[in-house]
A protein has these predicted regions:
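Amphipathic alpha-helical segments
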Residues: 15-30
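GIY-YIG nuclease signature motif recognition
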Residues: 1
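Intrinsically disordered, low-complexity regulatory regions enriched in serine/threonine/proline
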Residues: 86-119
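Conserved RecA-like ASCE P-loop NTPase motor core of nucleic-acid helicases/translocases
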Residues: 6-10
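Conserved RecA-like ASCE ATPase "motif II neighborhood" in helicase/translocase motors
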Residues: 51-67
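Inter-Walker segment of RecA-like/P-loop motor cores
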Residues: 30-44, 52
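SF2 helicase catalytic motif II
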Residues: 69-74
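Conserved ATPase-coupling elements of RecA-like P-loop NTPase cores
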Residues: 78-82
Length: 119
C-alpha cells in the first residue's frame, strides 16, 4: 500500500514556515521519526508524505500528486482587494487535484496525524 501524500498550501510563506515548525514540534513530541527533503519543503514519515507548496505557484505537480489537500486560508490576513486573486488561485488548484482528493484544513490534518500515531 502506498503512503498518502498530503499537500499543504497557504496564502503567505510565513504561515507555511510556521506550519513546518509546528509539525516538527509535534513529530518530536510524539517521537515520530521523519526525513526532510528540501524540494517543496517536504516531510516524509513511515506513514505519509507532506509537501508544503505555495498557493501562487506555477508548478502544479505537488497538487496533482496529493491524496489530501490541506488549505490554510486566513482571509482576515489579506486585503479585501486580493480576495479574487486568492479565490482564482484556489480554483486553479482544485482543478488540478484528482477528483477523489479530500480537501481539509490544518486542524483536521493535525487530528489525522494524532490518530495515526496514537499508541
Amino acid at each position: 500500500m502506498t503512503k498518502p501524500i498530503y499537500t499543504y498550501t497557504s496564502i503567505h510563506i510565513k504561515e507555511a514556515f510556521q506550519f513546518e515548525q509546528l509539525l516538527e514540534n509535534i513529530f518530536n513530541g510524539m517521537n515520530v521519526s521523519y526525513k526532510r527533503k528540501s524540494e517543496y519543503m517536504e516531510f516524509e514519515t513511515d506513514k505519509f508524505t507532506l509537501i508544503c507548496a505555495p498557493l501562487f505557484s506555477n508548478n502544479c505537480f505537488p497538487y496533482k500528486r496529493c491524496s489530501c489537500l490541506i488549505l490554510d486560508l486566513d482571509y482576515s490576513r489579506i486585503p479585501f482587494a486580493a480576495y479574487d486573486k486568492v479565490d482564482y488561485a484556489v480554483e486553479n488548484i482544485l482543478h488540478e487535484i484528482h477528483h477523489d482528493t479530500e480537501v481539509i484544513d490544518k486542524n483536521d490534518f493535525m487530528k489525522i496525524i494524532k490518530k495515526m500515531y496514537e499508541v
